[in-house]
């Protein structure tokens, strides 16, 4: 899977949420991650919200879209933050005990 993101946007995200987009990219490897279509924020492009584990035990919420360049698909990360307690609960309910 290939990723892309805006470096300026990533720096803003790090200052605001303490999460780099590189760290967020690891959530896509989580087999228990939950990916949901974000209809409310998909006016100009389809946006998706991925809830899953990054490196270690950190559960993140990653907003992203998919881009296609000459038949090559990329995941464009838009924002990422630590999951709320409620989001963590949703994630943990999906995982095997």
Model-found features: residue ranges?
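Ribonuclease/tRNase effector modules and their secretory precursors
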Residues: 1-97
């Amino acid at each position: 899977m290939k990723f892309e993101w805006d470096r300026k946007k990533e720096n803003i995200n790090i200052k605001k949420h303490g999460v780099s987009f590189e760290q967020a990219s690891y959530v896509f490897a989580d087999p228990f991650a939950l990916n949901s279509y974000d209809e409310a924020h998909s006016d100009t492009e389809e946006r998706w919200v991925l809830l899953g584990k990054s490196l270690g035990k950190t559960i993140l919420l990653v907003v992203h879209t998919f881009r296609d360049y000459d038949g090559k698909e990329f995941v464009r990360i838009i924002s990422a933050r630590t999951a709320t307690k409620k989001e963590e609960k949703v994630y943990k309910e999906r995982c095997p005990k």
